[in-house]
Structures are given as structure tokens and as C-alpha cells.
């Protein structure tokens, strides 16, 4: 597409139609077709970049319309030269009717001083808008659209009027709650905001399906919210209702209802979850469950208030000098005292060992940890090994070289009998 400046240099109109012949008139081809837009356009010889001009009167010019600039002495034919342009050249531009509304340019965008001298280019409304190709001899198709006359004020570029969103959005321009039409002030309706719109151009009021409106509830006002709270307090069903329920009596739970004026009192009651209200409005403590009742005594026993002021001291102390042993039970002290005695009555029966212990439990530990394992420095005894087939902890007798018991053999040595200690730590 050529630039606007080059196009404006080549645009021009021969005003004096007496000097134009039938072959010198610009062709009315596809590039110069009239506008196909349904919007009425001004019948000017410079209409919106289209070179299609209306029909000329028989005398060739209009009296009282000097096609000259108002601010200069140079006629406009000196600025716009169209006669030198080839008749079939379409300037590389698409037809104006095929352009979108945003791509179309006004004449004032590339013609200087057009807006201020627009009075000189407007034709009377009573002039016919069609060409008579028999009279003028112009190659113009007879099937040309006739545009109704329009006012000049409709052609000027007026700024788009500003309307609030409630006036342009049909969802906000009418009340969507049929049972409470007073929620929306009548001043915000579409008919009051745009009285200049005709009946055919107005938007249909029913733009929301009833299925979409049904589950929606109107946001309650402060007075409705207070009334619902009072009704909720005086309600006495068969089962107690928790006061922290976020729903109102009507079941409406909207964000605006939680932000209304009574939300402070409403949320304060929600923090009182373990409290019920009866019909008279008196608070009743919720009955604790049995499980909670069982846990309460154990928690009370662990509190510092229930503990005794003086902890019971250890009563049994070791009397040996230098020993700080303390015991809670007497049998524990007795067993401890054997460790301080010089007597070691419990002796190992394994040949070659003969270790003695003061306590029988220590001797049993010696059997289990020392003689029941292979590879140690102590002698292995198969009768003391739980994993061996010869396991017999009561066996006392001669052993083979590998630690197995000898068949029919008995131990004649005078050794202390194996004592099993019945004492253990508690």
C-alpha cells in the first residue's frame, strides 16, 4: 500500500466539469466503488478516501461553492491533481468497502485544512445522489446505491460518550432478582441511562437464563442481616444448632453477607464453637464425651498442683564405706551386698575353668556368654550352646576335645552344684 503522503499528492478533482470530456472522467471501477457500509456516509467529492463523487448538475458547478481554500488564494485544484492519473489505475489499494472500520481513514487525516473548510464541500441534501449516465456520459453503472440524506453533525468525529458499566452491560443494567426488584435503583436501568436509543436498538432485557438466576440470592442489607440473626437466635429446633454455622436462616451465604455490618457479632459467635443456645438464649455448656472425661483425671494427676511437696526419698542405702548405692526395695539391697562380700560360692563346673562368682546370676551369664561360643579363648561346651543338638544346661560330666559330652561319663569331681538364682532386678 502506498503511503498517505504520496496518495495525497496525487489526489485531485477537476472542478470545472465543462473542460472534462466523457473519456477524461475517472473510471468508476471496483477501486472507486461506493461504500458498502450500512452506515450513511456524506455525499462529498472527498468522502473517506473514495474517489467516487456524486453526480454533477447540468451547469457543471454549484453557485456559491467556490472550491478554494478559505485561508489561501490558491485554488484547491492546484493542490489535488487527479486528471493526470490514469483512469484505470487503482493505486494499489483495495476497495474501500472491503476495509474494516478501523482501517478506514477520514479525509481530514490526509487532506490539509479540510475540517476548517468543510462548509465548502457539503452538497445540499435535496440534490440527487445518482448518476445519469445518459446525460453526463460517464461510465457509471446505473445500479448504484442511493444513500438517504444525512445531517452534517453525524459526520463529525465526536468523542465516544462515556457510560458506566451498568449502562452498557445488560447483566448489570437490570435486576436479576425477580422477587426483589427494588434492589437495583431505577436510575441505573438501560432506558433511563440512554433515552436516545430507539426501541429497536435497545438491548433485550432478558439476557440471563432463569437457570442461572435461580441459585443466586441477593446480598442482604444490614437490616435484613440483623433480622436474620435475631430470628436465628430465637429459633428452637429439636436438636441444638451450633452458633458457628456460617449459613443464615434463609440459607444464603454470599461474600457480601459476611462483609455486612453485622459480621462482627456474627463472627464472634462462631468462635464459641463448644457452646449451644437454647430457646431462651441462655448459653449451655456442651457435654464432654466419655473419652474426654477419662483423660481429664490423668491430666490432673500430672499437673504440678497435685504433686506432693516432698518427693519420697530412697530408703535403702548401701552400708559399705565408699559405696553410694541407693535402692527402693530390700531385696535389691541384699543382692547388692553380696558383691561386697569376699565369699564366691558359685563356681564354673567346666573342666579347666573353675571361675567363682558371688552371685548365681553372674555364673549363668558366664555360661551363656563364654562357653557357648566357638572360637573364644575359653573352652567351648556344646551342652551350653542353644543351637547345638547336644544342648543340655544341666549336664555335668566329662567333655570330648571338641566340647561334646562323653556318653555314659559322669563327673566325679567334687564341685559345687549349679545354683539357679531366683533373684532378678525389678
Swiss-Prot record:
Alphabetical keyword list: Activator, Conidiation, DNA-binding, Metal-binding, Nucleus, Repeat, Sporulation, Transcription, Transcription regulation, Zinc, Zinc-finger
Zn finger residue spans: C2H2-type: 316-340, 346-371
Keyword Ion transport: no
Disruption phenotype: Abolishes completely conidiation. Results in production of bristle-like structures instead of conidiophores and conidia and fails to produce ergot alkaloids. Reduces significantly expression of gliotoxin biosynthetic gene cluster including gliM, gliP, gliT, and gliZ. Impairs down-regulation of genes encoding ribosomal proteins under nitrogen-limiting, but not carbon-limiting, conditions. Abolishes the production of fumiquinazoline C.
GO molecular function (one): RNA polymerase II cis-regulatory region sequence-specific DNA binding
Gene Ontology CC, one term: nucleus
Comp. bias regions, Basic residues: 288-297
InterPro entries associated with the record: Znf_C2H2_sf, Znf_C2H2_type
Protein name, entry field: C2H2 type master regulator of conidiophore development brlA
Species the sequence originates in: Aspergillus fumigatus (strain ATCC MYA-4609 / CBS 101355 / FGSC A1100 / Af293)
Gene from which the chain derives: brlA
